[in-house]
Amino acid sequence: TLGGAVVAICLYHSLNPFLSLLISIVCGFLAGIITGVLHTKLRIPKLLSGIITMTALFSINMFIMGFGSKGNTSGYASNVYLNGKNTNGVVIKTIYDTFLGFFSAKNYNIIFINILLVVVVLAIIYFFFGTEIGMSVRSTGMNEAMSRAQGINTSLMIILGLGISNALIAMSGALYTQVNRTANNTMGVGVLVIGLASIIIGEAIFGKRSFKNWILSVTFGAVIYYLVICLALKLGLPDYCKKLLYALLITIVLVIPLVKKAISKNKNKRKGDLLGN
């Protein structure tokens, strides 16, 4: 929501769409740093640190969006719409309007730019986590005690890792706002479940044999998740049944590894019986 609120206000006040996206990413990074500092420096438990930051951001987001509500005198707002004109009297343009000359349909612009951004972000992530600092962040995430024993500044790595993850979250919120041309204080509700489901789906189907494979599995897991949801809605499933579909999909995905293991075990048993005979 922070990324969406920031990009909405930047666009409303006539900033360049790409610069607005960058500012929202920086704001997300700072929010992640705050969470990391609460945990590493103030010794607040991990989960509680995130809850504290998230609670504070609820009010901060409303304060930020208050700058984009025309005629608003209260100083805060729960939503911002980008369908009108900016402060210079020009129709608000998002990054998805950039390639309008290449594609006649708006949906093609959205798909093209999103694919382009995904490829760029994946390339940056893959390169960064292959560096010494990136490897230190990964090591800290896997085994903090062992990383500390190897001389890694685990507190700094935790802060950096949270900053990067929150920067990516803010980026997704900013893109979501530009696609839908609106930002509201509840747009982030349920995103955590979707993220976890995407990871589970990706790992269950593609596995996580290497870091490259892990990144791609998470990415394609998210795509598969939304394809299944969209397909169900296209087939006429009522909108209020989405949560039930989410639950069923996650359950099925969690069962897949168990089924694979059972099949593999059964094959090995048969092979052993044949060799025994």
Predicted regions and their residues:
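Membrane-embedded helix boundary and interhelical linker motif in transport proteins
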Residues: 1-41, 66, 209-210, 234
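Short, non-helical or kinked segments that cap or interrupt transmembrane helices
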Residues: 1-6, 17-18, 38-52, 133-136, ...
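Helix-loop-helix "hairpin" substructures at the membrane interface of multi-pass membrane proteins
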Residues: 16, 107-187, 192
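Alpha-helical transmembrane segments within multi-pass membrane transporters and channels
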Residues: 17-55, 116-119, 220-221, 225
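Transmembrane alpha-helical segments in multi-pass inner-membrane proteins
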Residues: 22, 169-244
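Transmembrane helix-bundle core of multi-pass membrane transporters
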Residues: 46, 50-53, 57-130, 160, ...
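Loop-to-transmembrane alpha-helix initiation sites
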Residues: 47, 75-77, 110-115, 158, ...
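Cytosolic-side transmembrane-helix boundaries in multi-pass membrane proteins
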Residues: 80, 87, 142-149, 153-156, ...
